[in-house]
Amino acid sequence: MLEKISEENISIGVHAADWEDAIRKSAQYLLETKKIENSYIDAMIETVHKIGPYIVLGNHVALAHARPECGVNQLSVHFTTLNPPVPFGSEKFDPVSLVITLAAVDADSHLELISELANVLMDEENVDKLVESKNASEFLRLLNEMKEE
């Protein structure tokens, strides 16, 4: 699934006022391309308010997501590097420097993508390289190289 990602699915060096703004900005492309509805963005934020920063996975990465029925039209993903990094309220893994917005249409169509991402992102050095990317082209090249390792 990572091979289907294009430069349009990547935003580099985004400034966000806070974690809510970071989620909104990371989801903006998916909203503009009608992959998700605005209700999905609201649901992602509302879930963090209710449950806490469970979306912060480690290595300063947040995986923003909500339930498919909250407004997903098509399986999609968007990567956003934050500059500067933004606290999400996770004592252990703040601040977040990479937000991955995942829109899944059902319970399992995204599992291959999650598996591929986990293999890449569990290495903190990989995350650092991705976050330091100068542009979407470099980010995509690095992501594809890391996937092959």
Where do the model's predicted regions map?
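Cytosolic covalent-transfer regions centered on His/Cys nucleophiles
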Residues: 1-149
